[in-house]
Each structure stands twice: as structure tokens, then as C-alpha cells.
Amino acid sequence: MEYSTLIARLKTASESFENLEVQLADPDIANDPKKLESIARERSKLEPLVIDFNKLLDTDKEIEDSKNLLKENRNDKEMESLINEELINLEECKNQLIQKTTIALLPKDPRDERSVMLEIRAGAGGSEACIWAGDLARMYERYGQKIGWSVKPVSASESDMGGFKELVISVKGDSVYSQLKFEAGVHRVQRVPATESQGRVHTSTATVAVMPEADPVEVKIDPTDLEVGTARSGGAGGQNVNKVETAIDLLHKPTGIRVFCTQERSQLQNRERAMEILRAKLYEIQLKEANAKERSQRLSQVGTGDRSEKIRTYNFKDNRTTDHRLGSNFSLEPILAGQLDEVIDACIAQEQKRMMEDFNNDVN
């Protein structure tokens, strides 16, 4: 992006920020809590960008002053050296601010701030794939707890040999989707199963779908499209276990999506959870259809959410995790312990780089 174009866009953002501050001082808006909260939120989002814009303007002024000072001290070698050193530092600071503000101006994914439903399904590999699905669930649970998110299983189909055939986890918190969306795809494991007597390495897979939570307004479900059944729950519930039908079996007839929810203690709670999962699944379908054209035009695999996409291999023998999108290796043990920051940050950086290239092409 041309520097003049960047400055023009930053000025527009600064003007919007000033306009929001004027609105916040308006008594009529102050008496409307919902509108006040919305404007305050928008102002809060713009404030860091405006601060960096002002820093950029100040840095430009300092560079100009230093260059003028350099002209005045051409005969003073010591002063000239000091000014040149200062100019190098100022130019470096300017470049950092240009990159930071350009990234901040990139189009935002409106779903990034949402909580998610994380669906993990055992893939190829039989019982070992189910065990692997359970390992992935624990990895995400540890990661979420470390950040301070609320992580709770809402639907599970356990395997007789351990682990899960399918597991849906609710992850609630700030900007959950912005981090976990990079986990969507096929996760492959290479290791010797506990049941393997010959010590041979087996390859198994599990798929992860990351579905941003949807509001009822965004996904309207016709009650006549639902087939609702009940069953006795095998989960927590004390004396209610196997006596009261608290589990909910929900079928969405137009799509064939089935949700079986047993984790809550009451039938009403399980129904609410099942509807929450169904909305997220239907919302994911809507998003995939809406973005199909864009995805076909982009070769990048980052953030596509395509379940057929192999994104990562976990090799136990070599204690190595390979992220195929990044072409980078990471130590296995920290990753499984929930220390995903390094790999997710790298995915974010890769996506930002791709978006900056697209952004510059659009501008030019």
C-alpha cells in the first residue's frame, strides 16, 4: 500500500474515532444503555489504531526535524553521526508502526470475537483413533483453561476401548474463534498404540471442526423441521441416572444433522445445549456456502475450516509436531500439554501476511 493511501485511511479512522467520542458525550445516547455500550465498544476498538496513527505522525515530524538538523550540522562530524544514528532508529520505528497500522486496517472477520463449539471426531484407525480424539480434547481443554476460557463437554459418544467416537466441546470466552479457527482440519498421529504387541507404529486420524456460536436470529430453525426424542442418560445425575429420560436426541430433518446431548442434568438443559450445537452446525454450513467462491480462489489452507484438510501430524517416536500449513516443526510434549500459542501465533502471522498481500493488490 502506498504510504499516502495508508495515511488517508488512518485519517478516516481517526475522524470516526472523534465522531464516536462526540456521540458518547451526547445526553440522548447516554440515556440509551444499549446504544451507549455499542458506541463505547466501537470506540474501544479504534483507540489503539488512533494512538498508533498519532505516533506515526509524531515520528514523521521527528524524522523531518532530524533531517533539517542534519543539514545544519554538515561540518560537525560528531553531531552528524549522532543524528544519522537517530534517523536509523526513527525509520525503524516508522516501519514498525506502518506494519502495525496496516495489519489493524485489514478486514476483520466478524466471527473472531465469538465463542465456539469444537467438534472432534475419530477418523481412520479404529479404537486408536478414538483414543486420539480424547487426547486432542484434553489438549484443547488445557489450552483453554490456560487462557481463562470456559471449556465444557456438551455432547459425547464414548468408545468401549477408551476415548471418544465423537465429542462436542463448548468453549466460551473472549475472541475464542480468532484462535481456534486454525485448528479445523485433520489431525494425524503416528505412534505405537498401547494394544500393539509388536511395537509397530500406527497412523490414526481425528477431524476437528470449529463452529462459531450462532444467535437464534442468525439461524432460524423451523420447529416442524425437528424430530425430538428422549432417552435415559448415562451421565452425571445421581439417582436420576437410567431412571429419568434426561438425554435429548435431536434430528434436523432437512439436513439430516443429528445431535445427542446427555451432559446436562435436566431434559430442558440438554435440549438447550442440543439446539445450541445444531445452530452452530447450521451456521457453519451457511458460512461454507457463502465462502465457497472465495475459498476456491485462494490456494492458502489457513483458516479454511475444511475437514478434509490435513493440517498437522503428531509423531510420538520423534517427539515432533509438524504443521503442514506452516511447514514448521514443534516439540510434541508442550503441544499436547496445551501450549499451542507458538503454532497458533504463527498461523495468525501467516494469515495476516496473506491478507496484506491481497489488501495491497486490491488497493493497487
UniProtKB/Swiss-Prot annotation:
Gene3D superfamilies: 3.30.160.20, 3.30.70.1660, 6.10.140.1950. GO terms for molecular function: translation release factor activity, codon specific. Transmembrane segments: none annotated. Pfam families: PCRF, RF-1. It is found in: Cytoplasm. Methylated by PrmC. Methylation increases the termination efficiency of RF1. Keywords: Cytoplasm, Methylation, Protein biosynthesis. InterPro entries: PCRF, Pep_chain_release_fac_I, Pep_chain_release_fac_I_sf, Prokaryotic/Mito_RF, RF-1. The modification N5-methylglutamine is found at residue 239. Its main location: cytoplasm. One of its GO terms (cellular component) is cytoplasm. It comes from the Bacteria. SMART domains: PCRF. Peptide chain release factor 1 directs the termination of translation in response to the peptide chain termination codons UAG and UAA. Belongs to the prokaryotic/mitochondrial release factor family. This is Peptide chain release factor 1. The gene is prfA.
